[in-house]
Amino acid sequence: MTPEGEAIIRYTLRNDSGAEVQLTNYGAAIVSVKMPDREGRIADVVLGYKHPEGYFFDGAASGKSVGRCANRIAFGQMTVEGKEYRLEVNNGVNHLHGGTKNFANRIWESRVETNRVVMSLVSEDGDQGYPGELCVEAVFDFDDDNALEITYLARTDKTTVVNLTNHVYFNLAGEGSGSVLDHELRLNSSKILEMNERQIPTGKLLDAAGTPQDFREFRSFRPGISSEFNHIRDFKGYDHPFVVDGWKPNILGEVGTLREPRSGRSVTVLSSQPSVMIYTGNWLAGGCPETKSGGRYADYDGVATVSYTHLRAHETLRHL
């Protein structure tokens, strides 16, 4: 139960290979993904907490569906169709992830449809300062090829800002196994968005070639984290939006692959969105509740690959 007395429901999606995904209606969250290594050994490969209450307003938003707007809005101010809106400032001088009571910290309505779980909520006009009533669905499918598909659907009656995503952290060596800095990443991206000192995009595109942010071929995170490259050093690690090469609206395309050499596990990310945020868990230490493995996470114990849009009145957003 939540502190407000709302029921928390856990769902398990299991396939014929023995892999499984566990979800909860609190934050439309992924709380466990169990998948085999190259020897067939099953391990949980996403971060999470030992007790349900650990998910209540956790700063890491571990595994949860974030909105209305994932990431930061400078000074909590935005202009939509010529009108200025003020939002909660909850991250230094910025608005982050839709505010304190964002979608990650709410109970979603939930139901089972055949072999998938559908979760939904309604965000009223003015919720957290945003214009328009917003109706949201998150659909979770898991098949026998170990493919987990998350589809976000959103519809509004006023033009608004919507940026929905799932904030799952992977550790493909297994949850609780330590640092992910030796994981290897390949991205279909040759450019990144420049960020200012407040981690707000400036609108300028930077070439990744020749820098520690060039992941067009597999490379681990460790050399970049250890470098003096200012775009990484200033944020204590990777916390940057990478622009997807060849992106086309509403087309599901391959963004990249994360792999862990020792176990042989890998995750290939596909998305219909124009960019992906890579975050190496730079601030996990000290801020997380007791973990599933009974300890506390250190910085860099998980990596999030977060796909990141204006939604106009009476349009429907479909985000895969």
Name what the model sees in each region.
Residues 43-103, 200-201, 205-207, 213-215:
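Active-site loop/turn microenvironments that scaffold catalytic and metal-binding pockets
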Residues 98-103, 108, 245, 251-308:
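Acidic/His-leaning functional-site neighborhoods
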Residues 151-180:
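Acidic (Asp/Glu-rich), glycine- and aromatic
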Residues 1-7, 12-16, 84, 88-145:
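Extended, loop-rich substrate-binding clefts of extracytoplasmic carbohydrate-active enzymes
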Residues 11-13, 23, 140, 148-156:
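Short, well-ordered beta-strand segments enriched in hydrophobic/aromatic residues
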